[in-house]
Design a protein with these regions (language model features):
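Positively charged, low-complexity intrinsically disordered leader regions
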Residues: 1-27
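Short beta-strand segments enriched in small/hydrophobic residues
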Residues: 29-39
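Short, well-structured alpha-helical segments in soluble
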Residues: 74-86
Length: 285
């Protein structure tokens, strides 16, 4: 089993040293702004993790909790203010947003240099040309996990369930660059009842859909690497998208939920903030 907390602690310690060196060099702390709409259990967990890690790293963390009265024009104006605010190094927009908001339109108003989630069209487009600028923290976390498990990617059958711009799409491009054969599954795969078929042949399986135990343990190929990105609240329990107890009997490596991908994702977000801060101050410290 992969201990995400342990990996995250090691990475965070290294980041703390880098942020400290930058503070000594520049005399200012990195600062990030986070927008959150409505109450969402997964978002709340992530926000608490961000805030805690920011405190540990010496990063200034500003949270904007938006209510239903906050309209799109108001949020766009806030984005404009932050884009021109030289004190802000990174911006995060937590999803889900209000139904009335056009998320893509909102993204286009964000300064790509301050997009530390790697979701601005420019940053996503850079992945196609293998220019790794700001990468989705979740996709980066998955790659960090896989790099610790995989000796040779070439020719591996990779199956990714979920084609979001946060996980599935960027991860597919990153893994294709490793010369793997990537299958990207989505709701259409389930509609034609072919999900199990694809899962059964996966050497590497990544699941990120937000559906409790969607993937059954008995589907897992013997010796496969399983990365479960999902986080779902079922009663008083937090579970992933994979039927963990059965899957771990077949997988060579598997991430638990919680304490798997999540802690590393938060560190990767801060790594993107560090890179944005370095770029703004034109330093290699």
């Amino acid at each position: 089993m992969i201990d995400g907390k342990k990996i995250a602690l090691v990475l965070a310690e290294s980041l703390k040293k880098e942020f400290s060196l930058l503070y000594d060099s520049c005399g200012v702390k990195a600062k990030m702004a986070v927008f959150c709409f409505n109450d969402d259990s997964a978002s709340d967990i992530y926000i608490k993790a961000q805030s805690k890690l920011a405190g540990y790293l010496g990063v200034e963390y500003q949270l904007f909790k938006l209510n239903q009265e906050f309209d799109l024009s108001g949020l766009k104006q806030k984005f404009s203010d932050l884009n021109s605010d030289s004190d802000i190094d990174g911006v995060v927009v937590m999803q889900p947003l209000a139904d009335s908001f056009d998320f893509r339109s909102l993204l286009l108003d964000m300064d790509p240099a301050k997009d530390i989630e790697g979701i601005h069209p420019i940053n996503l487009g850079n992945l196609i040309s293998s220019e790794l600028t700001s990468i989705s923290p979740t996709a980066a976390a998955v790659m960090n996990i896989l790099n610790s498990c995989v000796d040779d990617y070439v020719g591996s059958e990779v199956v990714i369930i979920g084609h979001s711009h946060i996980v599935g799409k960027p991860l597919a491009m990153l893994l294709a660059d490793k010369l793997t054969t990537v299958t990207l599954c989505n709701i259409g795969t389930s509609k034609v009842n072919r999900l199990e078929e694809h899962v059964r042949r996966a050497d590497i399986l990544v699941v990120a859909v937000g559906k409790p135990e969607l993937v059954k343990g008995e589907w897992i190929k013997e010796g496969a690497i399983v990365v479960d990105v999902g986080i779902n609240k079922v009663g008083s329990n937090i579970v992933g998208d994979v039927e963990f107890e059965e899957a771990k009997k077949r997988a060579s490596y598997i991430t638990p939920v919680p304490a798997g991908v999540g802690p590393i994702t938060t560190v990767m977000l801060m790594k993107n903030l560090l890179l944005a801060f370095k770029k703004k101050h034109n330093t290699r410290v």
